[in-house]
Amino acid sequence: MLRIVDVTSETTDDLRCAVPRADFDVDAAMAAVIPVCSAVRDRGVEALREYSEKFDHVVPEHLRVPVEALATAAANLDGTLRRAFSESIRRRRQVCQEAEVETSSQPVEVAGGARVSQRIVPVGRVGLYVPGGFAPLASSVIMNVVPAQEAGVSSIAVASPPQAEFGGLPHPSILALCHLLGVNEVYAVGGAQAIAMFAYGVEGSDEADSCPRVDMVTGPGNIYVVAAKRCLRGTVGIDSEAGPTEIAILADETADPRHIAADLMSQAEHDTLAAAVLVTDSTTLAEAVQRELAPMVSATLHSERIRTSLTSKQSAIVMVRDIDQGLEVVNAYAAEHLEIQTADAAAVAARVWNAGAIFVGPWAPVSLGDYSAGSTHVLPTAGAACHSSGLSVRSFMRAVHVIDYTEDALLELADSVEAFALAENLPGHANAITVRRSR
């Protein structure tokens, strides 16, 4: 089912091209998204209602979901699911509190009377997008809201597409999680128009049809959501331009082929453009994984979607000489999710530099991270893991340098600053120092 790519004779420079990504042309989607963003900017609520009818086939009574609907959704939660939600929230919050929070620095005295410090401050207001396409990704509520709360964001809004099945409200699981997390500002708006609503703000006849603009938008979405983020960055801050999900697994002969097959399928289930890549030095393992995949795919609910993903160009089994070359491949690929299923997996994982998240050993599948590991599942895709990080508390915080100099400290450095400014042909900069010299 998965094609075989043999790189055993390839050089390091060629490894980045071993497995191409799926075609995900955000620029092409911009042609459809720009008019949507412009319409929301110019016509506000009227445009949002038109796009709800066009794309979601339902028009909610109000843009903002009533608080009572959030409470009702939480009250109707199945007990097992409520416990699963609560445990996921607890673990994600603990990791945020103990591993991700940055604090302001003590002032650094670079000279007598010359102090510089760094103040860490949260973003003021954020809009968090939760998709509802192939599946209602309720887990994205946790992954976006919890780090924003732990960062100290004072105003949090959530948007998710209205569902005809639920009377124009977002999926009940999404509403229930918002209630459990204490988020009361929830909008039944989806797609690119939701990103535009957050970026520009809209004002209706009352609060139920109004949304103040935000400072930053985060959360996953389809290609049109990504295009809207690209279109509106600068008007509003964004977390990333995330593409289709991807999993890479570095494995040797000690790995269980059934585990490998199940994990590859788990991410292929998301999208026909999802990437599933096994990197191994074991022909025996590769053949066993192929045998396991066929019946698993046929028996699962989303078999056609998974089969399309696994047989497309973005998915493959990559054969390498040894685990050392396998590490070169996965570091060049920079997967969103990377599993290490080898002997001495922790030591191998320590040699990985480029990955959105690393899952170590046979008992840490990507599905665990998708829901309840305590880690984030909003991760860089398409190779961006070589320079970008997943969504965390730090994503919602800003570092502000505070410069505090006395008069003597400035005058001690005046000659240097004036010389620097004049060397750059910026006499106005120099003059701002000169006018402060004693007359």
UniProtKB/Swiss-Prot annotation:
Cofactor annotation remark: Binds 1 zinc ion per subunit.
First-level EC class: oxidoreductase
InterPro entries: Ald_DH/histidinol_DH (IPR016161), Histidinol_DH_CS (IPR001692), Histidinol_DH_monofunct (IPR022695), Hstdl_DH (IPR012131)
UniProt-listed Pfam families: Histidinol_dh
CDD domains noted in UniProt: Histidinol_dh (cd06572)
Enzyme nomenclature, EC number: 1.1.1.23
Pathway terms, separated by semicolons: Amino-acid biosynthesis; L-histidine biosynthesis; L-histidine from 5-phospho-alpha-D-ribose 1-diphosphate: step 9/9
Any GO MF annotation of the entry: zinc ion binding
Entry keyword set: Amino-acid biosynthesis, Histidine biosynthesis, Metal-binding, NAD, Oxidoreductase, Zinc
Entry similarity comment: Belongs to the histidinol dehydrogenase family.
Protein name: Histidinol dehydrogenase
Organism: Cutibacterium acnes (strain DSM 16379 / KPA171202) (Propionibacterium acnes)
